[in-house]
Amino acid sequence: MNDKVTAVRDVWRYEQGEISKVEDRMVTEFPLTVILNGSEFVTLVCTPEHIEELVIGFLASEGVIRFQKEIKRFTIDESLGFVYVDLVHPETLDQKDYTKRVIGSCCGKGRHFYFQQDVKTAKTAVSQIKISPEACLALMKDMQQGSGTFQDTGGVHNAALCDTEKLLLMRTDIGRHNALDKLYGHCLLNGMSVRDKLIVFSGRISSEVLLKAAKIGVSIVISKSAPTELAIQMAEELNITAIGFVRNGSFNVYTHPERIRE
């Protein structure tokens, strides 16, 4: 499916006072419907690569599974845009938990979430890793330079799993949430520990993005964009260091600055 990630079309470009017809490369969108235990569960609009990682990461993020071994069958039908997933224990899945928006509290401390499953799956960060300011800047630069699809199209989000010195894994998608789910799915498929890892991200740190990072289990999120106020509240409560506006040699630390090495 990798050859379907981008497409070339004719466009009319205005430049230096003139309009000319040129070829331009753009990213594709792919609707992917997940059939879970024989019933339609969700349709994800995504960049069509690393599909297995995306679906497994999404299911884990939603609290449907915790481990890859909970999946009995996983089949991709590329021609129709369907993924069929059967769980080992389908009787444990309550469909109501994944279709109704509710507010729950975590550990009796009044934490507010969008879905009841967030209460079960968001993890309070426990890692005491520290990162230098220089590494924050370098990791962001490496991620931006490492995305060929972004360089070609300007139409995708990037997310990278890193240690405090280098990028370990990068995923790209038109949806910022999808890019994070692909990281999560890769970790589950490969038994990769995230305890002392961090995420570098191209999009803004919204509350949904912060929650996905918490579910993955990282303790530091670095973004070139701004966080929202609700995301900062959640980061404070979940013991996550939120770093934003990483650009031009500077950045802001919004929560838990003790993880920044002086």
Swiss-Prot record:
Molecular-function annotations in GO: sulfur carrier activity; sulfurtransferase activity
GO terms under cellular component: cytoplasm
Entries under Pfam families matching the protein: FdhD-NarQ (PF02634)
Principal localisation: cytoplasm
Residues annotated as the enzyme's active site: 107 (cysteine persulfide intermediate)
Keywords on record: Cytoplasm, Molybdenum cofactor biosynthesis
Subcellular localization(s) per the UniProt record: Cytoplasm
GO biological process terms on file: Mo-molybdopterin cofactor biosynthetic process
Residues in the signal sequence: none
SS bond list: none
PANTHER family in the cross-refs: FORMATE DEHYDROGENASE (PTHR30592), SULFUR CARRIER PROTEIN FDHD (PTHR30592:SF1)
Biological role stated in the UniProt entry: Required for formate dehydrogenase (FDH) activity. Acts as a sulfur carrier protein that transfers sulfur from IscS to the molybdenum cofactor prior to its insertion into FDH.
Protein name: Sulfur carrier protein FdhD
The species this protein was found in: Bacillus subtilis (strain 168)
Taxon lineage: Bacteria, Bacillati, Bacillota, Bacilli, Bacillales
Gene: fdhD
